[in-house]
Every structure is written in C-alpha cells, then in structure tokens.
Amino acid sequence: MEILFRENLARIARFKTPHGEIETPTVMPVINPNLNFLDESTLRSYGVQAVITNSYIIKRNQRLNEDALRHGLHSLIKFSGPIMTDSGTFQSHVYGDIEYSNKEIVDFQKAIGSDIITILDVFTEPDESYNSARSKVIETYKRLKEIDFEDKIIAGPVQGSIYPDLRRLSAYLMSDALYLPIGGVVPLLESYRYSDLVKIIFNSKVSSDFSRPVHLFGGGHPMFFAFAVMLGVDLFDSASYIKYAKDNRLLYSEGTRALNDIREFPEWSPIHGKYTPQELLHEESEKRTRMLALHNLKSIFIEINEIKERIYENTLYNYVEEKARSHPALFKAFMSMINYDTSDYSPLSYKSPFFYYDKTSLNHPIIKRIMKFTENYISNSRHTLIISSKYWRPGVKNENVIKNIVECTDFNLLVSWNGIYIPLFLEDSYPVQQLVSSGLNDKKLEEDYLKRLKSINNDIEFYEGEHYDKRLRDYDTEKINTIAMFQFNINERFFDKSNIIKSKSTGHIRNIIEDNNIIATMRNDGYLTLSIKGAYRLLSMKPWPGLRVVVDDESGRFNANGYNVFFKFIKSFDTGIIPGNETLVVSEDDDLYAVGKAAVSGIEMYYYKSGVAVKVHEGVNKKAA
C-alpha cells in the first residue's frame, strides 16, 4: 500500500494488481458469474474500480469452469479491471464441507487469472467457543502456509470469532499474506452487532502489517462504512446492492427503506425523474430489480466518496460522530469505539476545527493526548492555579490579568476548556483555539477531572483575582517552552535566551531566534516547525531513538539536500513518532541529515515500503525546494 492521505487509522491509499491500481477506500461489487446484468461501463460510471466473484461457483459449474480456464476470468466476468475471487468458505460454512481442498481451489483461482486469490479459510461463528475458534485460527494459518504464493496477491482471512486476543493472533499470523480480509463477520452485520464489529476490526487492524490492504468481508451496507474505515478498513465487498434490490429495498447512507414506504426518490438517485416509487412497484420484476440495484450502487459510492473527502479534510471523526446518532446500533458502536485509544496514530493537528458536541467529544484521540500531558505538566508538585472562564476563554482573555499571573508567579497554570483543565500555554495550539463548541459542558465530569488532577498534585486552587508584584518570568518564553514540552515530549526547557518575533497584525508568535539564527517558527496550528539549528538542539536533548528516523547513507545524502525520506530507505525509527510532528532524519551514527514532518506514526513506519515517510523541510546542506 502506498499511503496518500490519512486520519488516525483511516487512509486513502493505493496498491497495484495485475489488472491495474486500486485506490482505497472502495467497494467491490459482488458479481454472480451466472447472472451479471451490469456491464463494465455501467459499473465504472458509478465508481467501481474492482469486483469480486466466487471461484467455488465457477469451479463446480462445468460451463463456467471450462470458459474461465479457456478464456480467463476477466473474459468470463466481462470486466477488464482487478477481480478478486472468494474461495467458497461461506458456502462451506452454510452448506457444509465443499468438495475441493484449499490447495485445489487456490490453484484454480491462479489458473483462471484472478488478481486477488483467497485461501479456503475456516469460518468462525460469533457464538463459537474460545477453544474451537482458536483451533480454526490455527488451521486457517496452516492452510495459508501450504500455499505457494509465487508472485500472486494471496488473501489470508483473519478469523477468531468475537475474541480480541484471537483476532490479534490471527491478524499477526495472516500478515504473511499480502491481503487481509476480516472474515466471520456476516452474522454480526446482519444482526446489527456493530459494537462487536468495532472490537473485531480494531484488534485485527492494530495487530496486522499496516502495508496490507484490510478488507471487511460482507460489509457492504453503507451505514457502517465510515466506522469501519475509521478503524482501518480499506475495502468492502457488497452483494447488498443486488440482494436488497431483489427484495424491493433501497440502501441509504443511514439505513434501508422499503420501496413501498417511500414517497419519492432522492435527486441523486439514478431512478429520480424516471419513475415514482409506485410506478416502479408495478414495473416488470427484472427491470425493477435492475433500477433498484443501480440506486443501491449509487448510494454505496456516494458514501465512499464522502468518506474519502472526509479523510482528505481530516473530518472523518466528526462524520462518524454525526452518523452515530442516526441509528441506536451505530451509537452503541461509537461508544465502543471511543474506548479504544488511537492517539498513537492521531496526527499532531488537523486541517479542520475540532467539534465539541458534549462530553463524548473528549474521547477524541487528540484530546486524550492533551489530557495525558496535563497530568504530566502538573506532576512537578508546584502550586497550580486554575483560571476560570471569567478571565480566559478560547480566543478571548483579560490580557492584563493573565499576563500578571503568568509573569509574576512560577505556578502551573490551567484553564477550563470544555469540561476539562488544560495548560494555559497551549491556548493557541490545536485544538484549544481551533474549536467549534456547543458549550454543553458536563459539571460532574469537570468535578471528577479536578479530583483526578488533585490525586496527582493536591496543591491546586482557583484564581480569585489576586494581584502579584514581582516579575519572575516571560509570558512568551514560557509559552514556547510548554509547547515544546508537549510537542517533543521533553521535560526540560527548549528555549532560553530567545528573541521572539511576533506578527505586527495579530500579535501571534512567528519566529524564535537565537544568535541571529531562526531556531523555530510557529505554525498556524500553534505548534513549532524546527529549522536545522532547532533540529540540532532537539537531537542533543532527546535520547536515542527519540523522534528519529534512521536512513542509509545513500538516502542521507539526498535528505541533507532537502529531499524527502522514502520508506524503503528507513533502517530504524522511534515508534513514538506522531504523524505530522517534527522528525529528525539521522544516520546510524546519529549524525543529523535533515528535519521534516512524519507522514505516519512510528508504529506504522516499519511496514510501508513505498511512498514518502518524512516530508523534509530543511536538510543540513539545503532547505527543501
């Protein structure tokens, strides 16, 4: 996978197959080889890049078998792009053992020219016993290992029922395959057990090779797409577009509606303006099914396109939070999802403002990171003062009062922010000021959070309007040092005798200069971009391997001249790197080559083999162009 854009575990990425590239996230419509009434041009016009069909059905039908072997799968299906084949696992699960072995069905898929070939895995039911599920996980892995991959894309399904540790084990083992479907989930999807799916997807994703495409088998209803993508799913397959059409049902992004229950078709529907619902109900069955299938396909790809746009905008989390209120099962899934800490994968900041709805918004991974820092910030046992909204709110403050408190005390200073307390000096940093808030704070949560902070430092009180006389420190210097502490995870002062240059129009900090050299500039999101001088300073302060990406000498020579770092040249790295944060590019001897922004988290660095890992903004020899 080559990553293009990302938000936490969600990504827009692409990978190559023998019949072309696939950009994810996307959906593969299921094509019945016996009955394919949508031609390739129609499928392409709706956004279809790849399709999936069942090799078991083809193999056991003499006519289809002979045709596929003689002319190839793409001729049989009449689709020139990538085609994935399933192995018959679900048929085996529903109807009992099938007549072909794992190796036979895989060899058949190879022979007919499938682009993505699926092994015959062993299906695990949601109500399966732990021991039974574990034995099926091991058996599925054994089946993967008996296959000769050659140069093919082999899909190794992740099984394990609803047991998190088995899903983790299976994902780790099956990462030997180049493509990772998450299997055994159709019964959960059909019964709206989305909270169980959240558990399955998260545990499968974080234990897998991040360079592998992750596919949710059978996850073809658009109402759950955004949740699955947020948790790291790249692809879906959908028979629902035709299955629901045959049953006179229509797919929408928030659920399903019966044809006889709707008054009119939405304007985006390909049926709009051609039929009324009542007219279509009386249409001949085959034509009605085709029209409803086109509506359903359109609904699926509208949702996929919306999700991709949300990833690009960095608003997918907001979208999931919005969609959670569209169905009780989705809300339960969202409440399950926020229990998982994905802050390791979360970028330093987002393109779009932070949306605060209510206390559930505080489970956003970026807020969890700030809350963790707040606890560390006050752990020095200093007197801690909380400044109320009377004196400080995002973007609005009593300048004289705040400056007096800051410069004439050495206290830890916190402000009230959406029901929690955070360091005052992060006031301009994302998302403290880059915020759209409902103002619906939870007083009980605020009280509980204060108790938690007092368990760390009991010397906490609220500011009551006192005036302080003796100047002890500089406001701006304290601010940039606190930002550096948070951004670089350091416990000592990064700046000391600095000359701080501010914007004449806004008064915001722009450059930090020492000895006539720019050490850092303040980004629009309130965080620091380091110059090469600043990078040398960070290198001296952070013990190995902190915030480092180690590259070979060949890459290092290019990086020193301002060129980006590519994944394939990385030799080692700090797993604590945050996407979008400053990253030091060094040699194996810890000599600095460059500084830039990490494209992915440190946890992901190991897995990707193509694309840009660090976008360099300055090398030791030259700035980036």
UniProtKB/Swiss-Prot annotation:
Instruction: Quote the InterPro entries the UniProt record gives.
Output: ArchSynthase1/Queuine_TRR, PUA, PUA-like_sf, PUA_sf, TGT-like_sf, TGT_C2, TGT_C2_sf, TgtA
Q: How is the cofactor bound?
A: Binds 1 zinc ion per subunit.
Please give the function described in this protein's UniProt entry: Exchanges the guanine residue with 7-cyano-7-deazaguanine (preQ0) at position 15 in the dihydrouridine loop (D-loop) of archaeal tRNAs.
Query: What name has this protein been given in UniProt?
Result: tRNA-guanine(15) transglycosylase
Q: To which protein family does this belong?
A: Belongs to the archaeosine tRNA-ribosyltransferase family.
This protein's gene is called tgtA
Question: Would I find Chaperone among this entry's keywords?
Answer: no
* CC annotations in GO: cytoplasm
The superkingdom of the source organism is Archaea
Q: Which PANTHER family match?
A: QUEUINE TRNA-RIBOSYLTRANSFERASE
Which SUPFAM superfamilies does the entry mention? Pre-PUA domain, PUA domain-like, tRNA-guanine transglycosylase
Q: Which Enzyme Commission numbers does its entry carry? A: 2.4.2.48
A Gene Ontology annotation in the biological process aspect, one of them, is:
tRNA wobble guanine modification
